[in-house]
Amino acid sequence: PFLFDQTGFDAAIYFGDAGWPGTEAHFLMHEYPVPVCSPTLPGVQPHMTPEAIAELPLLQQSTRPYAWRQWFAAAGVTTPRAMTGMRLELFSMLAQAAIERLGVALIPPFLIQQELANGSLISPCPQSMPSSRAYYLIVPEHKAERPALTCFREWLVGEATENA
């Protein structure tokens, strides 16, 4: 829950479902994570199948514990390994672990554009999986019409739409 009345915050960017009481939720973007790893991870090859990805060490994000299972299910693959592997809390931690050759992580490409561009991370299997949740700008109803917040909201929604 958002405690806007008890803090000085005017808004929050939230990944989840819309519909928090007393707030307006403005859709920003869906999340489409893809498998990423170091190009030098042992066993990795270009153009791998989901079945081949299942044989590599998997890196898990603790806040999305079923992500690999859902990704494999969307690819039609059943593997007991979908719930195994090192668990990390943040996408930045997953990205660094993947760069350090600790395994394959599921990360939305928009969060690792630089790493993909410079080759420190690759996507050996480009199959993405749309998340059932999305990113939203959450604004308390009583602050929604403030000019500065309206300007920020319009800019942020425009940027998210342009870069989605």
Give the predicted meaning of each segment.
Residues V36, L106, I138-P140:
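Short hydrophobic/aromatic beta-strand micro-patches
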Residues T40-L41, L111, K143:
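Short, well-ordered alpha-helical scaffold segment located
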Residues P126-A164:
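A late-sequence structural motif
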